[in-house]
């Protein structure tokens, strides 16, 4: 069911004025989806940058798995999505409205595609993963576009460990 015009206007204002500025602050540079100044072209450019840097340091020895989180939007639990938003928002009214929007998708699992709120929510859900890969696992060459990501590393075991998480 399509969102009504007045609801779409409210969601757009909520995203542009509250959610986007607060939530994207913690995003890594190489999270390339649904953000001002980023997109598919940026993701491709960042991929080229990472491949060049890796190649200059390591040559062609290494691994580059391209990964997709299967059924990402359809299988995101609402509790996880709401927690990811609340963790990053200071405005509790905006958090409550966002919770209602997430719950409007019905059931306890699944975030609808296409909504601006859905996109920013799903980016926030994987923000902790981005930081874990970059900071804890120290995988320097990592690029993500929504639920697709690429890791570049010389140690296959390190990558297999990362992919099991």
Describe these PLM feature segments:
Residues 10, 14-18:
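Active/ligand-binding-proximal structured segments within catalytic/core domains
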Residues 17-26, 85-93:
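A generic secondary-structure signal for well-formed alpha-helical elements
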Residues 21-30, 56-60:
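Short secondary-structure capping/junction motifs at helix and strand boundaries
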Residues 37-52:
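Short acidic (Asp/Glu) patches
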């Amino acid at each position: 069911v399509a969102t009504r015009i007045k609801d779409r206007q409210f969601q757009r204002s909520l995203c542009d004025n509250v959610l986007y500025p607060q939530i994207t602050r913690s995003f890594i540079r190489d999270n390339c989806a649904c953000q001002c100044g980023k997109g598919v072209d940026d993701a491709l450019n960042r991929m080229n940058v990472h491949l060049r840097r890796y190649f200059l340091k390591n040559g062609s020895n290494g691994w580059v798995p391209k990964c997709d989180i299967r059924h990402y939007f359809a299988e995101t639990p609402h509790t996880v999505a709401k927690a990811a938003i609340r963790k990053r928002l200071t405005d509790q009214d905006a958090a409550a409205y966002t919770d209602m929007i997430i719950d409007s998708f019905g059931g306890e699992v699944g975030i609808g595609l296409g909504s601006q709120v859905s996109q920013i929510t799903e980016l926030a859900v994987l923000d902790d993963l981005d930081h874990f890969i970059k900071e804890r696992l120290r995988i320097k060459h990592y690029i993500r576009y929504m639920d697709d990501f690429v890791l570049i590393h010389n140690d296959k075991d390190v990558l297999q460990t990362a992919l099991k998480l």
